[in-house]
Amino acid sequence: ISSATTSSGTFSGTLAGSGTLDISGQATQYLQTGNKDYDLAVRDGGVLVLKGTADAPTLNYNSITAGNNGTLRIEATGDAQGSANTTLNVENITFQNGSTTELIYNFNQDAPFGAPMLTAGTITVQDGAGFLLSNMKGNAAMNAGSDLHDVVLMSATGSISGLEDGQSLAARISGLFAVYYQDATLSRDGNDILLNATLRQENLFASAADTWNSAAGAGLLWEARKNLDPDSQLAQFMNGVSTMINDGNLSGASRAMAAAAGSTVNALGTAQRDALRDQMGWIRNRTTLMGVNPAY
């Protein structure tokens, strides 16, 4: 499947027989069904999204190759309460130099890191392969009370090559991951590839603030991160700004934070004005009923 212009499609039917799907160009292909006799490949600008369903969160394939300038995304089945992460089972998978693999979790469940997202017979990680960890866009809260330590992301029943035992590589993070954590790494421990990350100490949003208003918005988001109502618009907004920063859209993040700060100031002004109106009404009523003290 190749496209010279931007295109996107979703397939949720049945993959019959056996075969190979090769995604390239500007095509984005969603697959919501699996077949252990199929080989998948994505390269040269293509995006392949593997996304299970509520009824079938596990997808099975024979082999997957994430090629140069290709993006492989393993995305949770949804962002609702209890929606499972997608689990991928393959005979072998190869992450080539120049590829990007995105692991997208649903944090709106009790144990988002309870099981690996990928299990394979063999895993090959070439030098220069990139990895990104993020969450569903609809997520607005993350239980981030401590460092992430030895979270199993991938597991091999056979062997892992290209990443030596004990060796680690830096991973990119975005969304709520980047709000609460920093210094994410993937490392090999025997037949597992583990995630480790430390709680973020510096204000993520400050790096994109280039005006007084955007700096005020950055401070607002940073201070509010642990006291947000998951259903609030501010929580959704924080997730979006974090993603913009990760994508390099610092000017967009700055404008968004400035708007947030301005909205907050306006809201406070409105609240003060309404409170003053109420107080003046109470004074008027008291004066009407009881008169005015002659001393005044």
Residue ranges, per PLM feature:
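Bulky hydrophobic/aromatic "packing anchor" residues in well-ordered structure
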Residues: 11, 15, 101-103, 195
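Secondary-structure transition/turn motif
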Residues: 2-5, 53-54, 76-78, 196-204
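GD-rich hexapeptide-repeat beta-solenoids
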Residues: 1-13
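Extracellular beta-strand/loop-rich repeat segments of large surface/secreted proteins
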Residues: 17, 21-25, 30, 35-39, ...
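Outer-membrane translocation/initiation segment of Type V secreted surface proteins
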Residues: 136-296
